[in-house]
A protein has these predicted regions:
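Active-site neighborhoods and metal-handling regions in enzymes and metal-associated proteins
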Residues: 1-114
Length: 114
């Protein structure tokens, strides 16, 4: 919602993941999207620091992607030699979703829904 800190969103994503017995993949994040596919702000799938009510806020007209990356046990990333493929350190199954959202008039529209 408009006025919410992006860290609050990160914290909610992490709580959702952990409540189901999983952990987020660290070091990767969602992002703003506009003239370029990856723009500020970065939106981690976990709370960085200890204050969710800090940092940039969601503003009317923003478009951004959230990208929950979910691991079974170990959220430590290992990037392959191709510099793109990534797995969790323990090699167990992981999952990655991406949704693009637009915020306007205090409403959110998920643009990536078919």
């Amino acid at each position: 919602r408009v006025g919410m800190h992006f860290k609050e969103l990160s914290f909610e994503i992490e709580k959702f993941i952990r409540a189901r017995g999983f952990v987020p993949l660290y070091g990767f994040c969602g992002h703003g999207i506009g003239k370029h596919p990856h723009e500020e702000p970065e939106i981690p799938n976990y709370l960085e620091g200890n204050n969710p009510k800090s940092g940039p806020k969601i503003k009317n007209g923003m478009v951004f992607c959230i990208e929950p990356m979910i691991c079974q046990k170990d959220g430590t990333p290992v990037v392959a030699e191709d510099k793109w493929s990534t797995r969790s350190k323990d090699g167990l199954r992981t999952s990655h979703y991406e949704h693009c959202m637009a915020v306007f008039d205090d409403k959110v529209e998920v643009l990536s829904v078919a």
